[in-house]
């Protein structure tokens, strides 16, 4: 029974010596030789043995980690009768323990719902077992500490005790195996006549030391290899040394040997670096960690430092280096990429390496949480927990597990989209609405549904799809909820979930995905689908095993299962024989590597800027370690560990070391280089730093040629270089050679043409062919005024909405257009009610105005947007505010009518083929025509002797005025069109001809009067009248004006219309008026604009040409922005800049362009 320690820095040949020693001994005796290495190194050590010359296979030699050795010995001695708990199971049990003790927690009661909390607790409990720290010691130590620490340890204690109670000596964790191993080693026959070699560790936990002590007592010899600085053993421990942990391990092993009366052979020290093949790498490895500054005066061959623009440029630079190294004879398996922050690089590396045709193995387990099956389970449980809210329901729906396997996915997705649109538009946000008896009724309703028409065939077909999909969701989800709410124990809850997964045929869905992935060659994806079901089965089995008899409620079950789902990970396949390995620095499973790329060497990353991420802060640990010395030290006392990690990286390669860092992150934030890089550059005075650029155009031709390493990656660079060339920048001949090379091969030529076509890309549309235009819009264009205004706003917007019939997804929310519908509907209803009762505007009292408004709102509220105004308390309040506006508008209109001779003769008057008035017909080219149809809010009439006047009033929920500039550009055609139609059809409407009296906007809003002193009721009414003055354009005729405001006096302004009378009885310049001749010119011009638009539509005009008038553009509220891709930064995408001009100028232009129609 002997202990021997082999010591020396990394790369000095310790592992090679041990393997050689064993190879000699195997031939000399029949002993068993066991190598114990860290978990992540077992595969690499086995591979090294197999590749070892003169070693006759593995006979007589076994490679174990501590945990694998525990399995082996416990299988032999009978210590495996208890059930093993995975990390997932541990976190679920901890969550159950925390939930049970939640009311007793002093600090962690809120943290129990925080994601990651249970993983942190699991890590702390793991540490306690590894370091043989009892909870009693923790509690005792915390007694004399601050209240904060004491409360924290109190919470940890009661959760830990409940956790141990739930395990109840029936279950084992990884750490329990080492405890049992230490107990069972003496009973093992397998360890008789055995020598143990322990290699690859820098430190040992207390549990591992206990196991090593038992092995010392049992086995013939225990040899331990430690990477440490030999002088520190001889001259004393340096508190901040990177070898502090291994030096402490050295002394702990000697103390163990002494306690167990074990013979200690003389230490064997290795001093010379044998791994590094160049002086520079050997110097760097030997000098690292020395307090004394050491400088390398020669040119440092095979050591390089690179700055990159960003992480992508960095990885592309690494990829180019790898490609060059393979041309020089290296294999991919000779190289590894190491980083401290793997999460910043894994996806990027996978993408870039694929474009360079470099096989890569990413040594990182991926969380299962994003797999559709896991998301389906989580979302289904959340749907039940949150009363069938939209978000979790459709997160589950989109995984496709509710639907049959037989039907095509594309068909199912289309149907699911139809269902989702219906649910969103109808505000279906709870279980009651989902389970409500009877079919859901589908009608394509826009605005007020006062006149319900029979369903169309299309609506009936859509309704059928909606109810089909609804039943596929409701049936299994209702069953799941029923079973979960009946469940009392963990077993019953788990069975409810399992039966739900059976009901939706989850296994068949996963199997179909697996088969399809295999057929398409996506083997890794196929394995993930296979693992997903296995993982859930194991999770439920483990849940039942541990918590099956525990009493639970629904919330607790969902929280515990969610914790388990968060902990699930996909297992990794070992790397193939020839792949580049990407790994994080701390867990790299590497032994002998020729080339290392250490990436992401930034300040704060290497060395790591320490943060308190665990349950116990650094301050907590420092305070507790005064009495619980086995507890791991705080981060600030582990400074040497960062130096050691860097040392492992720089001492790993035998041939080449590439060190790199990005100068900026993805958002352009500046990143500094690591202090370690500054230190290395200080030691190597002749070490020059090169740059990995995104754009190599500034480099020399020779340097640019190094960027050409693969056809796919080079094509992207070539495109960007040619783009710069188009802008006038010089282009190296290197890129012309690359360009020509793509057209020497047919397949590559096709790919190049497709990619390089982007050089000539312009975001422009081509006019539709005549036939296509007529198919989309018809030879006779049936259009509304707003449609034509949209065409003049942007031709492509018109094409998207009226040609392609694209629609924005409807949502169950009250929008401005809905409020406009309510206001129009209310005014129509009140006017109709007055007519039914033989009453006129102006004859109502204030009380009657309020009553009318209330009755109108009562009638309209259930008829807008699927009863949205009745759907919630918030909507009830909005309804109240809308009622205030309608009441105010009714009162104002009533007061205006008292002072006006104009009376309504038409409300919500339809014009069109089926309207009260015929459509406005506009002749177009090629014998086509445009039929204009729509609805006029209100038509007023007044008579004076032999003259009859007609005017248009439009109700608006926001302030509007008639701007002739907007009329001229076709953006505001509505009011003058309506005026033209009623004047043209006056004989049909009122039985006589009429003159145009004007167009006015009535702003419906809840106005307030501001005053410095208290006002009488009469004064308040006058102020409200003044604030409610209608805007627009009226006839420049004193007679017409006097009919609009019968109270208007000389020298006064009207409170009703935009008019002011001078003392001489004429209209002032401040009045917004136009002559009869000007109105006629405007009417003719408007018809001309419709003709212009109609002809352009038939010509296939679909240009992306939004206007810009001051700061206003149609893009601001356009639902098709992502579709058209309009980008003002492109030369091909520019606004049509419109300018405001004087009224006289605009009228002159209208006269010239409009002419007589």
UniProtKB/Swiss-Prot annotation:
UvrD-like helicase ATP-binding domain: from which residue to which, for each copy?
Answer: 1-278
Q: Which domain of life is it from?
A: Bacteria
Cofactor note text: Binds 1 [4Fe-4S] cluster.
**UniProt xrefs under Pfam families:** ADDB_N, PDDEXK_1, UvrD_C
UniProt KW Repeat keyword = no
Enumerate the SUPFAM superfamilies for this protein.
Answer: P-loop containing nucleoside triphosphate hydrolases
Tell me the residue numbers annotated for binding ATP: 8-15
One of the record's GO molecular function terms: double-stranded DNA binding
* Keywords annotated in UniProt: 4Fe-4S, ATP-binding, DNA damage, DNA repair, DNA-binding, Exonuclease, Helicase, Hydrolase, Iron, Iron-sulfur, Metal-binding, Nuclease, Nucleotide-binding
Record flagged with keyword Hydrolase: yes
InterPro entries from the entry? ADDB_N (IPR049035), DNA_helicase_suAddB (IPR014140), DNA_helicase_UvrD-like_C (IPR014017), P-loop_NTPase (IPR027417), PDDEXK-like_dom_sf (IPR011604), PDDEXK_AddAB-type (IPR038726)
Subunit organization: Heterodimer of AddA and AddB.
Role summary? The heterodimer acts as both an ATP-dependent DNA helicase and an ATP-dependent, dual-direction single-stranded exonuclease. Recognizes the chi site generating a DNA molecule suitable for the initiation of homologous recombination. The AddB subunit has 5' -> 3' nuclease activity but not helicase activity.
Matching PANTHER family: RECBCD ENZYME SUBUNIT RECC (PTHR30591:SF1)
Family, per the entry? Belongs to the helicase family. AddB/RexB type 1 subfamily.
**UniProt xrefs under NCBIfam families:** addB_Gpos
Q: What is the protein named?
A: ATP-dependent helicase/deoxyribonuclease subunit B
Question: Species name for this entry?
Answer: Listeria monocytogenes serotype 4b (strain F2365)
